[in-house]
Amino acid sequence: MKSVRTLLVLALIAIMALTAFWHAGRYLSAPAGIAQPADCIVALGRDSGDRIVTALDLYRRGYAPWILLTGVEDSPSDTRRAYLTWRAEYLVKAGVPSAAILYDEHSTNSRDEARNTLARANARGWKSVLVVSDPPHMRRLALAWGKAFAGTGKNYVLVATAPAWWQERAWWRSEQAAQFVLTEYVKLCYYLARY
């Protein structure tokens, strides 16, 4: 009888582990929302192109009059400036007036991006922002931005890009997606423990 109970417990643990594995991508991307009119579009750093393309699309569709570009994490300030420059040049070539592009050269992580954007929102009188990033980044962003914006009267909406490499229900099939998911779970644990 005891061995049957042990087998049932092990089977239940295996089912739970498989379920967690199967839904890992969905859990990370679930906080993404639907874009709505806002005061600014924030294109987060570490962008391979999808974030800036999504920000441009939102701008062209009239969701906000400003685009804020954030810096590259863990990079020297001159590298951050160069990184911000290529994204700004892309936007200008696509028709965005340079006066509509703002820069955050000081953020070194998602938490900084949220805090620095909130400070800018307060200074400019913004009420809401659209935060653009990749789908598996959404869960951690919800933690960082939710904490920064809590009780401020300001709103943010997380808007996910649509990268070709991402399939939330089959994330393990793409090496890039698998690396992103594993990295995000490590960072998520860090955020939960630290902040």
For the regions a protein language model found, what residue spans apply to each?
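N-terminal type II signal-anchor transmembrane helix
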Residues: K2-A32
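A transmembrane-helix-recognition feature enriched in membrane-embedded lipid enzymes
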Residues: R173-Y195
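A structural signal for short, hydrophobic/glycine-enriched beta-strand patches
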Residues: H23-W172
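Alpha-helical structural elements
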Residues: A17, W22, T161, W166-Q167, ...
